[in-house]
Amino acid sequence: PGREGVASLTNELMRWGTISYDRKAYEAETDAIAANVYLGNTFGATVTSEYLDRAMQLLADGMLRPAFPPAGFAVSKMKQLQTLSAAEHLPAVQAAIAQDQALYAPGDPRRRRATIETTAAISHADVRRWYASAFRPDLTTISIVGDMSPGRALSIVERYFGNWKAFGKRSRFNRTSLPQRAPTQRTVTVKSPSLAQSQVTLKEVLPMRLGDPDYAALLLANTILSGEGTGSLLFKELRIRDGYVYSADSKFDVDEDGATFSISYASDPKDVDRAQAAAVAILRRLQSVPLDDVELERAKALLAARRILPLDSYDGIARDVLTRTNAGETPAQADAFWHKVLALTPVQLQAAVRRKLQPDAFVRVILEPGA
């Protein structure tokens, strides 16, 4: 606490070279093998197979032996302060801050953010301490996808990352101790002189985490609401049928810390309330009337396509491996989950939406035209 922003500042400073190479020399080494190398809490390299060994050597050098030069720290800190100064008073930023304050109880770390004050308080030593505590092999997953054998990939990783050691105890965050705010309807309005229409977000915290039995059903419900573009339920009713909005979307996010569900739309100020009432009516219908089988099967097909199509690329395969590993999910568990998705019935989806969503408990944030 009091040093929010140290993580992003550390990421920025890692681009300033290593103990072996200064920033320009490091870039020259990666250019020599036509590699794209990026460093930070998310790190990686894209390179042809023949230069994988050298790319991994440079990647390990950047991750395990960053120089953290004082001059680079001063420049990076000033850059971050300038960015915060420019963004802090933007209406969209103020709206996002107000939303988090309304959604989460005092003491919840999700309310914390980098400010000019917290960033100004960060020292060069703070960056080194953060690096030592947060960049650890026991918090890292490395995925290699490409034209090589698994044995060669493992050998190269062990050669350059095998001596990476963790010091001290791994931090463990007790998520069950997070304070919970009782769900209740609130409205926050922020004026924006640059807007010609209102941008509205309805958002609520859901009583679930990754692995919840209702996860598959909520994914399908979100796909039905907004996953088919102009053919989605929200767009068809709020835009095409009623003419209340210019655009409409929904979002369902879930991880180990919790879950949120939101509906967002852009409308004329006079239609904000009517659009919300229509969106809430859709949710209530999903809670009270089972979907037609055809609609549910179409949503399943869309969701399955989003799962399968990215696996046609190296990046997609790598992201899939990392996502599953970070979630602690085995291939067998992933297969079981998708079998559950495909087997879900309209009645099961209806029951899950009724259990988890509270249409009367949205925090409403309105970014509206005005000075």
Tell what function each PLM region has.
Residues 106, 110, 141-209, 311, ...:
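An aromatic/glycine/proline-enriched structural segment found at the starts
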Residues 8-10, 30, 43, 59, ...:
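Buried hydrophobic packing residues in well-ordered domains
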Residues 23-32, 67-85, 96, 149, ...:
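Acidic/histidine-enriched alpha-helical segments
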Residues 1-54, 89, 110-113, 228-244:
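M16/MPP (pitrilysin/insulinase) zinc-metallopeptidase core fold and M16-derived inactive scaffolds
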Residues 27-130, 296-315, 319:
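Acidic/histidine-enriched segments that form metal/cofactor-coordinating
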Residues 100-140, 172-179, 208, 307, ...:
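Histidine-acidic residue clusters that define the catalytic metal-binding segment
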Residues 3, 16-21, 45-78, 209, ...:
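M16/insulysin-pitrilysin zinc metalloprotease superfamily fold
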Residues 141-146, 265, 294-371:
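C-terminal regions of mature proteins
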